Design a protein with these regions (language model features):
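Surface-exposed receptor/substrate recognition regions of extracellular proteins
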Residues: 1-9
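Surface-exposed molecular-recognition determinants
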Residues: 7, 16-168
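A structural motif specific to WD40 beta-propellers
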Residues: 12-14
Length: 168
């Protein structure tokens, strides 16, 4: 039988074997200026911030492969955008945010969903027909991939042991 223990922040054991933490969610309140969001126990490489205050702030998705000045707003149909005041750094125990209302409005409540890939270390991957830049955590089945498309049918290496089940 499989025994699972939940410590309120992350799954801690499966079959009584300790597993590393590759994902964690932390709630925080915006201050409208700058602040560090800590307590993850790892450097997040993919951060998804969502306001829970019932407002119209965008979801902010940022990763350490593309860098802090590139975000995707997943509740919008637009392309990736630049904004230096959302996630401003990926830190050893969390991340920091600037003054943008989508990620840090004064008194607004947020959830930060964070995944650990490879600590910001990328490698070139030529497994597909397009060479990609990959930051993979094969143990977690998670990777961040960056490539330049050619507008034709191409394949892209992802650094995982099996085909991805979700693409964002």
């Amino acid at each position: 039988s499989c025994e699972e223990y939940y410590n309120g922040a992350a799954w801690k054991k499966i079959n009584n074997v300790a597993i590393p933490f590759y994902f964690k969610t932390i709630a925080f309140t915006g201050n409208g200026a700058t602040q560090s969001i800590t307590g993850f126990g790892f450097q997040p490489d993919f951060v998804w911030i969502k306001s829970t205050s019932g407002n119209t702030y965008s979801h902010v998705l940022t990763d350490s492969t593309r860098g802090t000045n590139s975000q995707i707003y997943s509740n919008d149909s637009g392309a990736a955008t630049s904004n230096a005041n959302n996630v401003t750094s990926f830190d050893s125990d969390g991340f920091s945010v600037g003054s943008n209302t989508n990620s840090n409005a004064s008194a607004a409540n947020y959830l930060a969903y964070c995944w650990k890939a490879n600590g910001g270390t990328t490698s070139s991957n030529s497994d597909g027909s397009i060479t990609s830049t990959v930051q993979a955590n094969t143990a977690a089945g998670f990777s961040i991939v960056k490539w330049i498309g050619t507008q034709v049918n191409d394949s892209i290496g992802h650094g995982l042991n099996s085909a991805p089940e979700l693409l964002i």
